[in-house]
Amino acid sequence: MQEVAPGTEAESGRGSRRAPRKHRMLRWSATTLAVLILAVAGTGYLYYRHLNSNIEQDDLNLGDNKVAEPTPNAAGQTPLNILIIGSDARDNEENQKLGGAKETFGSTPLADVQMLLHLSADRSNLSVVSMPRDTLVKIPKCTDPDDGKVYAASNGRAMTNQSLGHGGPGCTVATWQELTGIHIDHFMMVDFSGVVSMADAIGGVPVCVDANIHSRDSEGHGSGLKLKKGTTSIKGEQALQWLRTRYGFEDGSDLARAKAQHMYMNSMVRELRANATLSSPNKLRKLAEQATGAITVDSGLGTVKKLYDLSNELRKVEPERITMTTMPNRYVGARVEPTEDAEKLFRLVREDIALDGKDAKKAIAEKAEAASDDPAAEKDEIGILVQNGTRTDALAAASGRASTVAGQLVEEGYDKAVSDRTGSLSEATTLVRYPSAELEGDAQAVAKSLGIPMSSVKKSTDVSGVTLVVGADWREGTTYKAPKQDDTTPKTAEALNGADDTACMHVNPGFTWS
């Protein structure tokens, strides 16, 4: 049975809300287009100050819970996670003309496109994870930064696209972090008209369908996309139609639409890299004006300089190292929910493991070589606090785990090991945390004594000394047995490589023509 938050409408998730300010709610996945346009552009136009005034800003995270930032790699680099949010809001006539039901004008917006861009710490690869708009999730409590209105956490599960109406894009960010455990650094949004203008400026993006398509039903519903079988270069409003098409592709679901969006984005990246016409300063200035005028970002990306710095990071990734995926899911009535494979995909992103599998050996080597330069103190001089983190949503904390493991450490010569009796925590995997570089060697020595992998030794400002958190993966025994982890991308994520120029969307037989 579908679960929804009280006071929401199960079918559409719409409700009343104050009229949104101009350009506040922006939409569709072509936000990525704005970033990538800047990524291939020259530097000359980037310093015009007036471009900064084009960029709208909003708060990054409206929830109470924060996710810790990832630990830097050996080179001091950290991954970068950007949430792309697209809204169905039609808050001005220009966007209303581009399609959609007239009755939705000015109503509470829904986040109908949600994609997480993960740029690896070493900037060698880029992963994209799409979440279907009708995914059932728990939306956390969020506070609107404009008027202070507090939106209570959902009672049960609600469709993820409703999160945008709970104070703004920062609530969608909070919802993603609650579900995935992934620290999100930034968000970006773009409007309908921005998609059209920027796609026009590029000059066309090639896409493929395996049959003639007209995505419009007998009642006039649908994007209106009409293409002949084969490859067509689309731009402007036709590009927007492609990004919005649902009925005409595959099974007519939002999952098919996400797949088509991935194909478009991959093709767009290839086109941007190959299109010599973008070397024209006039074209680049036009693109800069359109890109900065179309996007809304958090304050961390709120200037052209910051966007340019981001674009320089993104442009380091070659198309063959870009992987597009969709969150593995299963149907619950007309909605979907994450599967076990979804958590596996989220873990790969959290641990900065490339979804194309090409750096698996490198990751293993780095973990093996991660020994600290800081020598460990003598065992009997190392203070260790052991915490019980075995509690999960399904299981109570395993009784006495902190004292049992602390006792084992004392037997091994760590005389200053003590258990934390203040209460149980919830940690999926066992971790050894340390606050500063001078204790890194001590933390690694403790981990080695118990068989805990070096990848589970983390620097954290939340602790004041070496702290061992016994996780849910170690509910019994005194020697840690690291679970064997499969670091391959789940097949159910339907991965699409950025260099694949042979991909072709399957047309729903009910929407073809001759």
Annotated model-derived regions:
Residues 1-514:
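Non-catalytic, solvent-exposed segments at the cell envelope interface
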